[in-house]
């Protein structure tokens, strides 16, 4: 299976880069992983609603340029479906059984995802109603994908 993660913004912190490298290495035995970083737009401190919408649209356009027609797109969104780790593992497995071999996870910037990206998505996933830094979230997503593959294969890891 091919898994692509499209994320707004570059990882800045060394510890996050190391975690992404570690999970990427672990995942290499289960899937082909591709991580795409798109430029995040600077949000002024007192941005108006209109300015925030324009920023989301710009970031959304950059995301959409990286999405191909054959990709099954999973948008990470606060209004998405919440799954347990086991359900998430089953979800990925079921997609593979149905012939979906190109999964793409999309992580928005600090303002979230544009309506165009959400419309293009095939599924909306929510990890929690809490807000997480989008850079840290990339590591959390990779960990859950790795955990999902371990569960799928009946391998020790999931507790």
UniProtKB/Swiss-Prot annotation:
It comes from the Bacteria. Specifically methylates the pseudouridine at position 1915 (m3Psi1915) in 23S rRNA. Its EC number is 2.1.1.177. The keyword Magnesium does not apply. It holds the Pfam family SPOUT_MTase. GO terms for cellular component: cytoplasm. InterPro entries: Alpha/beta_knot_MTases, RlmH-like, tRNA_m1G_MTases_N. Homodimer. NCBIfam families: PRK00103.1-3 (NF000985), tRNA_RlmH_YbeA (TIGR00246). This is Ribosomal RNA large subunit methyltransferase H. It is found in: Cytoplasm. S-adenosyl-L-methionine binds at residues 76, 108, 127-132. The keyword Repressor does not apply. Signal peptide: none annotated. Gene3D superfamilies: 3.40.1280.10. It catalyses: pseudouridine(1915) in 23S rRNA + S-adenosyl-L-methionine = N(3)-methylpseudouridine(1915) in 23S rRNA + S-adenosyl-L-homocysteine + H(+). One of its GO terms (molecular function) is rRNA (pseudouridine-N3-)-methyltransferase activity. Its main location: cytoplasm. Belongs to the RNA methyltransferase RlmH family. Keywords: Cytoplasm, Methyltransferase, rRNA processing, S-adenosyl-L-methionine, Transferase.
């Amino acid at each position: 299976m091919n898994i692509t993660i499209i994320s707004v913004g570059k990882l800045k912190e060394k510890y996050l880069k190391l975690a992404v490298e570690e999970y990427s290495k672990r995942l290499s035995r289960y899937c082909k992983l591709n991580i795409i970083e798109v430029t995040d737009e600077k949000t002024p401190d007192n941005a108006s609603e209109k300015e925030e919408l324009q920023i989301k649209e710009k970031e959304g356009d950059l995301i959409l340029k990286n999405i191909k027609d054959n990709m099954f797109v999973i948008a990470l969104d606060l209004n998405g479906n919440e799954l347990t780790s086991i359900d998430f593992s089953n979800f990925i497995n079921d997609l593979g059984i149905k012939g979906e071999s190109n999964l793409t996870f999309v992580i928005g910037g600090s303002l979230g995802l544009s309506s165009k990206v959400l419309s293009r998505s095939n599924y909306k996933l929510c990890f929690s109603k809490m807000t997480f830094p989008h850079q840290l979230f990339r590591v959390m997503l990779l960990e859950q994908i790795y955990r999902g593959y371990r569960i799928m294969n009946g391998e020790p890891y999931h507790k």
